[in-house]
């Protein structure tokens, strides 16, 4: 299992579904990168200037939105993930 370090989270990006516009199937390179996913692992948090640990404000299992250009793509055991810093997250679906 993957465990992120510091203020990072590992997100399983929602699968891209083929999109049809007016009956035309869009090519995969015409689609934008998904911006929504489920958190599968959360780091311990970030340390401030005094060395105190600031805990993460998100949790495993939450669905989040993120900027389409943020994070690092990662492939592990045949699955695709995205590693993001907590500050890259835009919103949590409640």
UniProtKB/Swiss-Prot annotation:
Matching Pfam families: Cpn10 (PF00166)
Lineage: superkingdom: Bacteria
Keywords carried by this UniProt record: Chaperone, Cytoplasm
Entry-linked SUPFAM superfamilies: GroES-like
S-S bonds: none
Main subcellular localisation: cytoplasm
Any one GO molecular function term: protein folding chaperone
HAMAP family: CH10
Family designation: Belongs to the GroES chaperonin family.
Subunit structure: Heptamer of 7 subunits arranged in a ring. Interacts with the chaperonin GroEL.
Protein role: Together with the chaperonin GroEL, plays an essential role in assisting protein folding. The GroEL-GroES system forms a nano-cage that allows encapsulation of the non-native substrate proteins and provides a physical environment optimized to promote and accelerate protein folding. GroES binds to the apical surface of the GroEL ring, thereby capping the opening of the GroEL channel.
Protein's recorded name: Co-chaperonin GroES
């Amino acid at each position: 299992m993957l465990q992120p370090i510091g203020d990072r989270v590992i997100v399983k990006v929602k699968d891209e579904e083929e999109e049809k516009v007016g009956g035309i199937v869009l090519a995969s390179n015409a689609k934008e990168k998904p911006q929504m996913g489920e958190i599968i692992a959360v780091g311990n948090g970030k340390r401030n200037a005094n060395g105190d640990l600031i805990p993460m404000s998100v949790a495993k299992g939450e669905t989040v939105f993120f900027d389409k250009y943020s994070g690092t793509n990662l492939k592990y055991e045949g699955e695709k993930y995205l590693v993001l810093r907590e500050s890259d997250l835009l919103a949590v679906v409640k």
